[in-house]
Amino acid sequence: MVIKFLSALILLLVTTAAQAERIRDLTSVQGVRQNSLIGYGLVVGLDGTGDQTTQTPFTTQTLNNMLSQLGITVPTGTNMQLKNVAAVMVTASLPPFGRQGQTIDVVVSSMGNAKSLRGGTLLMTPLKGVDSQVYALAQGNILVGGAGASAGGSSVQVNQLNGGRITNGAVIERELPSQFGVGNTLNLQLNDEDFSMAQQIADTINRVRGYGSATALDARTIQVRVPSGNSSQVRFLADIQNMQVNVTPQDAKVVINSRTGSVVMNREVTLDSCAVAQGNLSVTVNRQANVSQPDTPFGGGQTVVTPQTQIDLRQSGGSLQSVRSSASLNNVVRALNALGATPMDLMSILQSMQSAGCLRAKLEII
């Protein structure tokens, strides 16, 4: 009885220690993806915040072409001083298995010198793919997340005003051809390449569906043998994607954004014992102009300007501090915070730690 209890307890501890995730959260089906669409159009109804047409001739040209298609002829040489029109680029993503009549969201971005797209309406804009075929038509009122006001030479702005979004603003007019259901194999692609995870997913599928049902081709691709036919493959994939797989530990990685100074690390990062000295060196250059004028204005003297430069060099910090070995992320954070370094200093410290072999992680700078 005691042996059974201990065995059940050990099994419970092992099960809770291993983190299980569904295959659908770790992979995607090769070939089932979105496709980008792009179009050029006009936004009207702006409250005097549109393009300055004298500086954006393409806006006037586009408007003339649109009016001519509507049967309106603008006299040659007419200088239209329009403030309520803006030229925009419209982008969208065509989802996999998108059908005719289905609506998708579009993003509208100004390409001229419009001050704001707030309150504007996008006129009918064809959206094309890389093959120059029209796959959707976009039109509708633009929702801009920003706000702004100006008066007397002063202005206040919150967030971006030259871009917006139209929810369900485009209607799919052409469907993409799909190869789904053709053939007896499908490839599952891992979100992150990992040989052990690829093999583990293949083993899990083989245990449930029989040996030979899945094969790990490389660190990212698992080939699965599926029955022929759309409906059969849909049912087969639905069962596979809901299978649970124990997630293996990730590679220890530290990501540094050199533009913003942000540092992000995952929980696998560890440190070995080391000593760190970080000093701050600042140089201040101050230049002043001294003006010397003669005491007697009519004595024939000359005004002389002499520059005076003062250079101040200061160095602070630099004491050697010990960093203890840390085996968990919380301890790593405490050890790095104990140095009292700024994020910019921390980037150079982490690079030096990796060079010294004290940082047990991959360092990626973006």
From Swiss-Prot:
Annotated InterPro entries: Flag_FlgI (IPR001782)
Record has Magnesium as a keyword: no
Protein location: Periplasm; Bacterial flagellum basal body
Signal peptide: 1-20
Entry keyword annotation includes Signal: yes
Gene Ontology molecular-function annotations: structural molecule activity
Entries under Pfam families matching the protein: FlgI
Superkingdom, taxonomy of origin: Bacteria
GO biological process annotation, one example: bacterial-type flagellum-dependent cell motility
Cellular-component GO terms for this entry: bacterial-type flagellum basal body, distal rod, P ring; outer membrane-bounded periplasmic space
Keywords: Bacterial flagellum, Periplasm, Signal
Xref: HAMAP family: FlgI
Subunit structure: The basal body constitutes a major portion of the flagellar organelle and consists of four rings (L,P,S, and M) mounted on a central rod.
Family stated for the protein in its record: Belongs to the FlgI family.
Functional summary from the UniProt entry: Assembles around the rod to form the L-ring and probably protects the motor/basal body from shearing forces during rotation.
Protein name: Flagellar P-ring protein
